[in-house]
Amino acid sequence: MSDEQQIKNGIPIANQWYSHWLWIPTLYLTRGLPYVILLMTSLVFYNRMGLSNGAITLTTSWFFLPFILRPLLGRFVVGYKSKRFWIILAECVIALSLVGLALSVRLMDWFLWSVVSFMVIAIAAALHDVAIERLYNREALLLERPIFFGLRAVSYLLSIIVGMAIPITLAGNLEVINRTVRPAWATLFC
């Protein structure tokens, strides 16, 4: 066994410092996506669906509630299962909620179901955020954390491009091609 390997649960693992370069960017990219979907893309979505600015503000302000309650949600992450379990569960719930959002766009009561879908995304995003922070604090050694600060920030900013610029551009192009708003957004969220 070389000097660059450690034994974790009886399994030789390469030096953790090098493996951080693989999981930190993807983890922080996925950390920023729900924020962008909730706090930016939803505004454009509701605007294009014809809601007034007052209704959009009132509706989307409720999506902040799970983030305010993060300390309470953090108790679930610590108390039950592993952090990786919560990360994977939250990502699956977010993906299923986006599919539900895509299906709700074509319904008559689309507004109610879109709010429910966005709220489920908000709760899952808050749990996801807590689990990522706790996992990072546990896995990244204290001396190495300053090295990864820039990597985390760049990955988080890339999530804004991936989560807002690309989908909204795609939805706009689909609106022009189809000449209708609802099918464009339904296609986007699926």
Task: Please provide the spans of the model-predicted regions.
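Cytoplasmic helix-loop-helix junction between adjacent transmembrane helices
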Residues: I121-V154
